[in-house]
Regions:
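N-terminal intrinsically disordered, low-complexity tails
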Residues: 6-63
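Intrinsic structural disorder/low-complexity segments
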Residues: 53, 65-68, 304
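Membrane-interacting alpha-helical segments
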Residues: 61-81, 145-147
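Amphipathic alpha-helical packing elements
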Residues: 71-135
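Non-heme di-metal
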Residues: 136, 143-419
Length: 419
């Protein structure tokens, strides 16, 4: 399948709707709640309150910094240049040599890369025979179940291509730290692997490839989400876009929040719950097992992205203004509204023990998690997780796959945590 082009969508595809909750609570100032990781993100920088005192009023220093362009790793060789030190490294706008992986500054990024490599899997390892038999049985699944399954595949199959495009064509270019770039390369491979998995499921079940892979063009609620992703990420792929000014750096930070907190952290979760619900009922267990592994990968992508965003905030506190925080809060809530619309469209009736109201509660629960991880105020009071079994599926500290279709051993999977 060819990669998707940013020109395929215009802003008109996105339904603009600002949820009332976006302004219902005050935004926190600079509190940071890092994603759970093997090493705290703040371990490499000074505490946020000290960073504020030293940097928020340092306009002259920031203007001096803006005079220099960041390295890309493609600069001409400079013989006899000084060796890279840890202190010279930074997440964005770094002028140190990006081709030198060590010494590490962000050890958490390197550990996530190692964990991802240890959790490697391939779609064709998973037996789809039972899925094929069930799908071919005219009485095996209801029409609603078949629609939900195909709708989820339709969004997933192109969304991971959009994610890969943004990683390769935009994010990698502007993150100026080699250990983080190392993880981004692994993430890009995993996005390709996920697209491979969707193709493997489609081919195994004999589904109409055109129907599945064109759903992002032909089904409005899928198109709305894809268009939203493109609208919030395409600017960074412009060859003329450069970081180094407050406006440009905030554009990058906004892209990362839209990319990780919303696209990776919200837009996939209705589909994840729906697909995994089949496996819980011993239906389509081969496909559900692959979705479980994809969910595991995506949870690591999300945690890495949150840690990277928080690191940028700590190193560049002048970017994290009250006005910018309000914009990011509204951006996340806009994504939640789109995903709620998607849930209601895909589940007009209760199926698999699920219904649209449960998904609305779940998405608000997820949104509170994302807001808190970024140091923003939670917007939905009294919300609990209506799908506690999702935590069991995501928990990697086990020797057997959740659906018991094959034995798996995760060497370092226990280092990961859903939160």
């Amino acid at each position: 399948m060819s990669l998707i082009n940013w020109d395929d969508f215009s802003d008109d595809h996105v339904t603009e709707k600002k949820p009332a909750a976006a302004t219902s609570k005050a935004v926190k100032n600079t509190e940071t709640v890092p994603a759970t990781s093997t090493a705290p993100v703040i371990a490499t920088v000074e505490p946020a309150d000290q960073q504020q005192d030293q940097n928020l009023g340092s306009k002259a220093e920031h203007e001096e910094h803006e005079e220099h362009e960041a390295n890309t790793g493609l600069e001409a060789l400079e013989m006899g240049a000084a060796r890279v030190t840890v202190d010279a490294k930074q997440m964005i706008n770094c002028r140190a040599d990006l081709n030198q992986l060590v010494p590490f500054k962000y050890k958490w990024a390197w550990q996530k890369y190692l964990d991802a490599c240890a959790n490697h899997w391939m779609p064709n390892e998973i037996n789809m025979a039972a899925d094929v038999a069930l799908w071919k049985d005219p009485n095996g699944l209801t029409d609603d179940e078949r629609t939900i399954f195909k709708r989820s595949l339709g969004f997933f199959s192109t969304a991971d291509s959009l994610v890969a495009n943004n990683l390769v064509l935009a994010v990698y270019r502007h993150i100026t730290n080699p250990e983080c770039r190392q993880y981004l390369l692994r993430q890009a491979f995993e996005e390709a692997l996920h697209t491979h998995a969707y193709q493997y499921i489609v081919e195994s079940l004999g589904l109409d490839e055109g129907e599945i892979f064109n759903m992002y063009r032909e089904t409005p609620v899928v198109a709305n989400k894809s268009a939203w992703v493109l609208r919030h990420t395409k600017n960074l792929a412009d060859p003329d876009f450069k970081t180094g000014t407050t406006e440009a750096d905030q554009q990058l930070l906004s892209n990362l929040i839209a990319f990780y907190a919303v696209t990776e952290g919200i837009f996939f979760y209705v589909g994840f719950v729906q697909m995994l619900s089949f496996g819980r009922r011993n239906k389509l267990t081969g496909a559900a097992e692959q979705i479980q592994y994809i969910l595991r990968d995506e949870s690591m992508h999300l945690n890495f992205g949150i840690d990277m965003i928080n690191q940028i905030k700590l190193e560049n506190p002048h970017l994290w203004t009250t006005e910018f925080q309000e914009k990011m809060q509204a951006l996340i809530l806009e994504g939640v509204e789109l995903e709620i619309q998607y849930a209601r469209d895909t589940m007009p009736r209760g199926v698999l023990g699920l219904n649209a109201n449960m998904f609305e509660d779940y998405l608000k629960y997820i949104a509170n998690r994302r807001l808190a991880q970024l140091g923003l105020t939670e917007q939905f009071d009294g919300i609990t997780n209506p799908f506690p079994w999702m935590s069991e599926i995501i928990d990697l500290k086990k020797e057997k796959n959740f659906f018991e279709t094959r034995v798996t051993e995760y060497k370092t999977g226990g280092a990961l945590n859903w939160d």
